[in-house]
A protein has these predicted regions:
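Structured, hydrophobic secondary-structure cores that serve as assembly/anchoring elements
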Residues: 1-87
């Protein structure tokens, strides 16, 4: 992730994998509600989160949602990063 990777499906898959792995670790530590990872959180990075205009501008957008331990709906965080730069 980062470096000079192109802002494409490969980068997005890498982001989903790495962020998903981090969120799964938090899930296993009891950080979220839900009995399965898919009930506890989601990671979305694709053509819906990152438009062609974003790609043209070198921006990748990631949505991360999670079900907090305290009663609430999902908390959703949008992260934008210039592709090819360190996070």
């Amino acid at each position: 992730m980062g470096g000079l990777e192109p802002n494409d499906e490969d980068l997005w898959a890498s982001l989903r994998l790495n962020i998903g792995s981090f969120m799964t670790t938090l899930f296993r530590q009891g950080a979220f509600q839900g009995s399965t990872p898919s009930q506890a959180f989601f990671v979305k990075v694709d053509h819906e989160t990152t438009t062609q205009a974003d790609i043209n501008n070198g921006i990748v957008n990631v949505l991360v949602g999670f079900a907090p331990l305290k009663p609430a709906e999902f908390v959703v965080v949008k992260i934008s990063q210039a592709a090819g730069q360190s996070v």
